[in-house]
Amino acid sequence: MGEPVLFGPDFDRDPSPAYAWLRERPPHRLGFPTGTWAWLITRYADAVTALNHPALVKSPSAGNEEWQRSGMGLPLDHRPSLASHMINADPPEHTRLRRACAGAFGPRRMQDLRERAQQVTDELVDAVEARGHGDLVTDLAYPLPIAIICDLLGVPERYREDVHEWSLVIDSADDTDGSKVREATDVLERLVTEVVEAKRATRGTDLISDLVAQEATGTLSADEVTSTAFLILIGGHETTVGLIATGALALLTHPDEAAKARQDPRHRAAVIEETLRLHAPLQNATWRFPTEDVEIGGRVMRPGDPILVSVLAANRDPAAFDDAGAFRPGQRAGERRHIAFGIGPHLCIGAALARLQADVAFETLLRRLPKARLAVPEEELTWWPSPITRGLFHLPIEL
């Protein structure tokens, strides 16, 4: 096998052969159409080293001149009104920005959101049950996370269809000149700004109101409020969509595992963790840049070199996981060695919320739709053509 192609329908459907080729070699210089390149880290041990390395920073300003000129960062990386959030920050700024949101993801709020997730899921499954068929992506995996993250943030109902439509565009791989992503970013920035302004006038009990209150005390700047709200709105639902869709597919195609998960909540939890490992809704961790010479996997990475950690490749590394390419929830029950949510200080703040929604969705599907089956052959399913997130366009079922 020659050097693999890391984009296209075949790769989207099954990236394992490409990643196996890459893991046999030191970190790879991955070229982009812009003419620039980045180090791609694919081995589990190297990924853990990179994600924990104190000399690898997140601030886009740390990228070298070639990367800065290339425009490889999302458009929002270069807008103060959208880039001033925790993903682009390093301690102590990262610590301050993360702390500003932490209360919204605490145990008490998670219990409230579990009850809301159950209500939303029941309503969505009611509709599928009444029709006798459905699409578990459009009928469940999308509307549930959007409803929950908008509830948490305090985004009114009238904006939610726009959130769905335009966030899809941001992850599109067919936007060769970036114009669609810029348009989507503009629309969603205006949406978030409108909601923030409304909360400044009348605060509620939601996260955006909390952020606005911290702005009033000087803890956060106006740009940090908007950036944080934007980050959580987009990042807080897209990966959960992928988790629910790919987990539902795994249950539909592994009836023995579905039967165990139906009876045992612990096995259902193992299904969620194995889905996160095998399908890693966030395929690649966000950019990192060395502040000094750093050696990882036998390669020396220079200050400013852009680095991507392939979470999906690392999670399928046979050096770290037995039967790494297979769905084996029982074999790995109780383990959380995968890096689907990252590790270290940048561990995803919404990890518990994503797991909660997946648990509610899977428990409800297994209980209420026990005879659900795929309505098309599995090989006909199409995967998102995204270098960022992993998920399905559709998951049609019959009852």
Model region roles, listed by residue range:
Residues 1-399:
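Cytochrome P450
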